[in-house]
């Protein structure tokens, strides 16, 4: 078969229309044609740049959060420091450097686990972190995490988990599915599949026809698993992504390639596919599991952790161009009209521990 588009078309011809989540899963993880198997997504030469690759300041603030959370939990020894979807290892590199600089005791107590399904990226991560002379445990599933106190980070991971979409038609919710028209192009259709009962049926009944609602069962399962684990072993987690604090409607499925948005049906497997994260649902799941949970905008979080103070330190004695770059990086990470407002930070813990104070 020549490409993923033809493979998906054949599936639809044989089995009928597919769900949005099936389409996303194939586009991202198909063993032969999937995006994560065939493309190089990260960095300026890739399809997108994540916050850790904009500036070391981002990872340093996460490192401060980790250390402060560890102290708030009573300085457990040993403890698990884990990241889900570590990319090229840039964020964990900055976190470990920060912890090592501020507390050798915490650094020695940390056992590093990177949850990564790409063998190529896992090798790159280990190579990047080799200088710390710590064993790097590369695992593919959260279930492989030992039962020690856990401090977990996931940056721009949740947006990649598949979603299903529902559209209101003539007062009823129907599932959006994908089929092929007479011209051989992918199109959305409304299929007679009801909105799951867990999706706030009463609230959803108030919206007009044409409204789209996105449901992300894998995100919700992930949140239940992490929250339950934290209650059992103690610890804290930090999930960072773009999305809304409150329940939101609309089609947020998007394709990105070479830093530009593309048609989601154009060349599946060659573009990154993501959607906005439903943070209100995730927070409620954490609370139901017995965790403390709070949502902050990324800019607010970074300022709380000492972004400006650290930036001033970093700029001392540096050239004017480098100082300008630091200011530009802060603007991009924390400004409300860039990443500061769109990106949210969900912090949750087994104890009533709010976002720790800066050092």
Question: Which functions belong to the PLM regions below?
Answer:
Residues 28-33, 193-194, 241-245:
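Short glycine-enriched loops at secondary-structure junctions
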Residues 58, 152, 241:
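Conserved RecA-like P-loop NTPase ATPase core
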Residues 200-359:
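Long, Lys/Arg- and hydrophobic-enriched amphipathic alpha-helices
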Residues 143-160, 214-228:
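Conserved adenosine/adenylate-binding substructure
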Residues 151-203, 250-263:
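A mobile, often basic/glycine-rich helix-loop segment
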Residues 119, 158, 244:
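Short, glycine/acidic-enriched loop or turn micro-motifs at the edges of active sites
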Residues 3, 19-22, 53, 57, ...:
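Generic recognition of stable, solvent-exposed alpha-helical segments in well-folded globular domains
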Residues 1-84, 88-141, 145-149, 306-309, ...:
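Rossmann-like AdoMet
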